[in-house]
Design a protein with these regions (language model features):
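N-terminal Rossmann-like dinucleotide-binding module
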Residues: 1-56
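Glycine-rich phosphate/pyrophosphate-binding beta-alpha loops
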Residues: 235-243
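Hydrophobic residues in well-ordered beta-strands that form the structural core
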Residues: 102, 127-129, 260
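C-terminal helix-rich "cap/oligomerization" subdomain common to oxidoreductases
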Residues: 1-6, 76-78, 306-356
Length: 356
């Protein structure tokens, strides 16, 4: 990201000083003072407020969210609280007229998501969802590959997210809105929706608990079918050991496959040599000859890189946040996409044993 801007930094108020805030959000604010200035912070735990106070001596501290929202010298409220409170806290912020950056998932049900959408519309569409998956370099490569004619007719998109973690936090507890269907899948679903050529019309899903120490799922496998020939096979696995990881994206076509590892900025296109043409042949109902029907097919591996100048990774997301708040440029993640992701996440959750 650029470090010099003619416009002043966005004045940010932090709501919820937990792991997500300090791991994903806060380092960005610290690293880019020309873009963001933390002016207020709210959490019930004093020790966490003290961390912010040490870095930002002039930052105003609060225990109650409602008190912080009475401050007027704020441009954007960054909400990273318990999933159960996302809708409530976002509505409170939007009603005060602040730009509101909300951690995923935006809600637990489609009804809640629609309620939040209504409030966002009343507040001049100042709700920004923290969905960074569409800026991941491996996703951008997969989207680029979807239009590569060397793959031939594409029939399947495969997405994999794998880790091994024995979660023991509230994200592993059902009654607190935990479970991979919510904390992991909304970003992945948005990626799938952007890759598929048409909207899904059918979904199959399976949820399991593998390594998690709570009662919520840490494994989700879904298949999205469209009216076209392309389907999406998606899996999040919180119990996959290191060294046994699959490519994060595979684009499968009639002439080959594109593969890329998680977070990688280069992938491999493995296809039948584009210069090769099959000899003409057609199927027959006659008694077949006693022979092997396999053919010698020339296969080539082609390294795949992002187009020059493509912005990717977390820096691309946060640059868009700044530009939207400061210059009113369109935010690249439409609210309808986040709502659609919640619809699928809630559906897979409520139809599983983990939704009971």
């Amino acid at each position: 990201m650029k470090t010099e801007y003619q416009r002043p930094p966005v004045k940010v108020a932090l709501m919820g000083l937990g792991r997500a805030m300090f791991s994903d959000h806060y380092p960005v604010y610290r690293s880019h003072p020309a873009l963001f200035d933390v002016v207020a912070a709210c959490d019930i735990i004093k020790e966490r407020r003290d961390i912010v106070a040490e870095d930002y001596p002039n930052c105003r501290m609060f225990r109650q969210f409602s008190d912080m929202l009475e401050e007027r010298d704020i441009d954007m409220v960054d909400i990273s609280t318990c999933t159960l409170d996302h809708v409530k806290h976002a509505v409170m912020s939007l009603k005060k007229g602040f730009w509101t950056l909300l951690e995923t998932p935006m809600a637990l049900t489609l009804d809640e998501a629609q309620l939040l959408r209504g409030q966002a519309m009343k507040s001049k569409n100042r709700l920004l969802m923290l969905q960074r998956g569409i800026f991941a370099p491996d996703f951008l490569l997969a989207r680029q590959a979807m239009g590569d004619e060397r793959l031939g007719l594409i029939h399947q998109v495969r997405i994999r997210r794998e880790d091994y973690i024995r979660r023991d936090d509230w994200q592993a507890v059902k009654r607190l809105g935990g479970g991979a269907a919510y904390y992991a899948m909304t970003d992945i679903i948005i990626q799938a929706l952007r890759l598929l050529p048409s909207p899904p019309v059918q979904m199959w899903s399976e949820l399991k608990r593998i390594a998690s120490l709570g009662d919520a799922e840490d494994y989700v496998h879904i298949n999205l079918k469209t009216r076209d020939a392309v389907s999406a096979d998606i899996e999040f696995n919180g119990g996959a050991l290191p060294g046994e990881r699959s490519p994060s994206f595979e684009i499968r076509g009639e002439r080959g496959v594109f593969k890329v590892a998680s977070g990688a900025s280069t992938g491999v296109l493995r296809v039948i040599d584009p210069a090769f043409k099959f000899p003409r042949r057609r199927s027959s109902v006659r008694t077949p000859e006693i022979r092997d029907m396999h053919e010698d097919v020339p296969v080539v591996d082609i390294e795949y890189s992002l187009s020059k100048g493509t912005m990717s990774g977390p820096s691309a997301f946060w640059k868009h946040v700044y530009d939207t708040v400061r210059t009113a440029s369109p935010f690249p993640i439409r609210l309808e996409e986040s709502i659609e992701a919640v619809k699928f996440s809630h559906l897979m959750k409520k139809t599983s044993p983990f939704g009971k």
